[in-house]
A protein has these predicted regions:
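N-terminal secretory signal peptides
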Residues: 1-15
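Histidine-rich, glycine-flanked metal-binding segment
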Residues: 23, 48-62, 68-113
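Metal-coordinating catalytic core of metallo-dependent amide/deamination hydrolases
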Residues: 52, 182-294
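Active-site gating loops and adjacent loop-to-helix segments of metal-dependent hydrolytic enzymes
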Residues: 126-157, 267-280, 300-303, 351-375
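Alpha-helical scaffold segments that flank or form the walls of functional sites
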Residues: 128-201, 220-232, 467-469
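His/Asp/Glu-enriched, well-ordered alpha-helical/loop segment
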Residues: 321-416, 432
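C-terminal cap of metal-dependent C-N hydrolases
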Residues: 406-463
């Protein structure tokens, strides 16, 4: 979504500091007491025994005999091969790796890196599908960016982040960028970080603005966040500044060593920032850029994050897939908002694949000369994995099954009714599969989903918490209560 201007915010008043009396430590303590966290699942003994113990120092797991897609051009792909996970890392990839580790039968599976989402406002998790017919302006800005955002307490941020992060894991997304423009107060920011941490997903926390008011300390509170929660470079959570076009904000990001993630759906807005643009910036949407701006992004080494379903549905403009390809700008996929679209990456891959090909076919029918090549299914799966890791500044750590990288791995069921018999691995992923095919998910070597079930969260408890939070926000926003015609008038 586009950043919200001051005129699009409404003051929220005093922050609710009681929830986080001592920042993230308060949330963690509450979670331990069962007040904020969702209790781990206690599976039956047989199921528990079947879940591999992995991700810890010295723990090894061998994924045996799968179709292995590495996203690493030096390694290539394998019709049948093994992946060895040791601790949090990928130790080896190849056919017939020696035994010596607990073995998981990956036959009938596609083994690949997890998907990487480069822009999602996950604080809105409990508001899924609430604005299905909405435009960006005025609907989203008014109903979500103002009414809902003003109503959120820190605990609502926590629940939204936790729910959306687990939803991402369930869909095979092992890394996401949380574009968190809900920093109404430092407590809200700490709640977002804690929700990400408690989910166990790999994430870039994009510290963004929030509802205007005396407790909003954006962007300066990023210094405290850096010290308190992001002092280590090798943790699951890393820090970015989610911002707009104020050069002073960019300076603060560079001061604390945080990359920049930026909504840009205007025309000409980047020109005053030309000298500040660099490879540490990822630009979102970009449906209306000038030719000069495209050149600036390309020359400065920036990346793109496209949310094509949202851009088409909500009125941002035509997703600039071909402009990115023409300018050789690395691009990636993002879900943006679950208020309108599903949280999976199969939807994202299909939408972008179909849209680019439709546009190229139209140019061919118009007898245009020198028509660009069509995207392939392999292209779009690469964009959804290593392309996302690059746009999230994490491609040295994740996004491919390169030995030495973090073991962010998914196993996709290739013998399921919707894709059997398997004839084309990339085609099955991009065109045939959905979340039901995500059989297992590893994040930093730890099992987060196993045999189709999430591991480490009580889904029923999480649902109850999400419903209570949703009901509170709806009551505060004074929306009608109905699931038939929508909570919001006209939706």
């Amino acid at each position: 979504m586009s950043e919200l201007d001051e005129s699009e915010r409404r003051p929220r008043g005093a922050s609710r500091r009681a929830f986080l009396a001592s920042g993230a430590a308060g949330l963690a303590a509450s979670a331990a007491a069962g007040l904020t966290g969702c209790a781990p699942v206690a599976p039956a003994a047989a199921a528990r025994a079947a879940i591999p113990t992995s991700g810890g120092p010295g723990q090894r797991v061998l994924l045996k005999g799968g179709v292995v897609l590495t996203m690493d051009p030096r390694l290539g792909d394998f019709e049948k091969a093994d992946v060895l996970i040791e601790g949090s890392k990928i130790a080896a990839v190849g056919p017939n790796l020696p035994a010596g580790a607990p073995t998981i039968d990956a036959s009938n599976m596609i083994v690949m890196p997890g998907f990487v989402d480069t822009h999602r406002h996950i604080w809105q998790g409990q508001l899924r599908n609430i604005l299905p017919n909405g435009r960006l302006d005025p609907d989203y800005f008014r109903d979500i960016g103002a009414s809902a955002r003003n109503a959120y307490r820190p605990e609502d941020v926590y629940v939204g982040d936790l729910l959306s992060a687990w939803g991402a894991i369930n869909a095979g997304i092992t890394t996401l960028l949380d574009w968190s423009h809900i920093s109404n107060s430092p407590e809200h920011s700490d709640a977002a970080v804690q929700g990400l941490r408690d989910s166990g997903i790999r994430a870039v926390y994009g510290y963004g603005t929030g509802a205007a008011g005396p407790s909003n300390q954006y962007p300066n509170d990023i210094r405290r966040l850096r010290r308190q929660s992001f002092s280590s470079a090798d943790q699951l959570l890393t820090l970015a500044l989610a911002t707009a076009f104020d050069p002073k904000h960019w300076e603060v990001a560079r001061e604390v060593g945080a990359p920049i993630t930026l909504h840009d759906n205007g025309s000409g807005l980047l020109l005053p920032l030309a000298r500040m643009m660099g490879p540490d910036v990822t630009y979102i949407h970009c449906c209306n850029l000038t030719a000069e701006e495209w050149k600036l992004i390309a020359d400065s080494g920036g990346s793109l994050s496209l949310a094509s379903p949202i851009e088409m549905e909500m009125g941002h403009g035509i997703p600039p897939i071909q402009q990115a390809l023409d300018h050789k700008i690395p691009w990636s996929l993002s879900n943006d908002v679950e208020t309108e679209i599903p949280s999976d990456f199969f939807t994202q891959m299909r939408t972008n694949f179909f849209l680019q090909r439709m546009q190229i076919f139209a140019r061919e029918r118009a007898k245009e000369a020198n028509v660009p090549p069509l995207l392939t299914v392999k292209d779009i799966v690469h964009v959804a994995t290593i392309g996302g890791a690059r746009a999230n500044w994490l491609d040295k750590r994740t996004g491919s099954l390169t030995p030495g990288k973090e073991a962010d791995v998914v196993l996709l069921a290739a013998n399921a009714i919707n894709v059997m018999p398997l004839n084309h691995a990339y085609g099955a992923i991009a065109l045939g599969m959905d979340t039901s095919n995500v059989d297992a998910v590893f994040v930093a070597g730890r099992v987060k989903k196993w045999k189709g079930d999430l591991v480490g969260v009580d889904v029923d408890q999480l649902r109850a918490r999400a419903e209570r939070s949703r009901d509170y926000v709806i009551a505060q926003a004074k929306w009608p209560r109905t699931v038939l015609g929508g909570y919001l008038p006209g939706h």
